[in-house]
Structures are given as structure tokens and as C-alpha cells.
Amino acid sequence: MFSKPLVLNRLFRSTRRLWLCVLIIFSPTVALAGEWAGTQTDFHSFDQYDFEVDGLDCKIVVPKEIAEGRPWIWRARFFGHEPQTEIALLKKGFHVAYVDVADLFGSPKAVDRWDRFYGYLTESHGFSKKTVLEGLSRGGLIIYNWAAINPDKVHCIYADAPVCDFKSWPMKKSSKATWQKCLDAYEMTEAEALRFHGNPIDNLKPLAEAGIALLHIIGEADEVVPVADN
């Protein structure tokens, strides 16, 4: 039997070694100058780069110190609007990523753009294979449609008043012109859209099976994206 002081001393040394390992594993690295091409601007004191990859309009915001493993949050639509979440994660060492999918409404065309951008970031820049998805309003369509196809690539989902059914918005809650853009993006007639079962509300099973955590911020009085419909 070991004496109590000896046991405590060994426990202390073991605990100290464990924390040293944790600090080494998760210690941040300083962002390298010249890693990103394109136009450099300021995003709330962080460096933002606007550039084109494979015909896609892209944005990256770089943390001052990059967390181990290169974690990142992927913003869908309305880049720069209400940036509190992005700023908080930048301070934690996350990159912020964005690729333009305007007027594609989470369609297969939008998913293809996201697939290509994901491949570029993970293969060319060593980003984490799992990302955090953030969608505001209509951004809900692409984050959920992409996640349903790629649940193994998603850490978690944060959505603010997300559109989860295009039969709610833009079909019922927007202009005829916007609804037609949505139909064109999906290459459907309205009759086909009404029979369509590929909206986020139809495809939650893959996310549940993968154990992906979801956080929604909603307003019960929201008339543009009604909670009951989405």
C-alpha cells in the first residue's frame, strides 16, 4: 500500500502532465502572412480575404491565432450581418468561411458549390474535416440540405430564424418573382415543387442519427419565416 502523501504526489504529477499535454495539443498557432490571395479588408479587426476559386466568389476571415486542428464556422448568406457569433469564434481561433450561393435556395446547385468549397478548404488549407454551420433566414435551406448529405462533416448547426421549407418561404411569403427563381434553381414546376420531399423539414433523420447538435433562435411573431411552417 502506498502512503496517502505519495499517492497524492503521484496524482498531482500525472494531472500536471495531462494538462501539459492538453495545452500542447490545443495550443494556437499564429496566422501565416501570405496564405490567402485576393483582396484583403478588415472584419472587426480581423483580416478578411475576398477571392475566387473554381469560379466561386469566396470569403475567409482569419483569426489572429489559429486553434489546433483549424476549426471553422461556415456562414450561409447575409455575410457580415449580426456578426457576433463569428467575432466570438474568431477570438477562439476559428476561421470564418463563406461562399456565395445567392438565389440558389439550397438547391443541388448550391450543394455542389458547397462541396467544391469544402474540398478546397480541407484539402488545400488543412481545415478541420468537420465544420460548424451557421444559417440566417433563407440560409437555413443550404445548411440543412448540405448537412443531410454530409452529416459526417458537420460538428453542429446554429440557425437564426431558418427557412426549412421553401413552400413556406419563398412560395407563400415572398414575391412571385422570387418563387420563380427558386423553381428555376431546382429546375421544377410549381406542381413538382408541391410534391417535393427534399426540404430540410423532410430530411432530419441523417442529422439525428449522426447526433448533430442543433441550436435555433426563433421569434414567435415572425411573419416572414413562420415557426409553425419551418
Where are these regions (language model features)?
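A domain-start/cap signature at the N-terminus of enzymes
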Residues: 31-68, 175-186
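Mobile cap/lid helix-loop segments that gate and shape the active-site cleft of serine hydrolases
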Residues: 40-45, 162, 167-206
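Short amphipathic alpha-helix adjacent to the substrate-entry channel of hydrolases
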Residues: 81-97
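Alpha/beta-hydrolase active-site loop
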Residues: 105-126, 145
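Gly/Ser-rich "nucleophile elbow"/oxyanion-hole loop immediately N-terminal to the catalytic nucleophile
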Residues: 116-137, 151-153
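Short glycine-enriched nucleophile-adjacent loop
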Residues: 140-151
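Short beta-strand/loop motif that positions the catalytic acidic residue
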Residues: 210, 215-218, 222
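Short alpha-helix in the alpha/beta-hydrolase fold that links the catalytic acid
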Residues: 212, 226-230
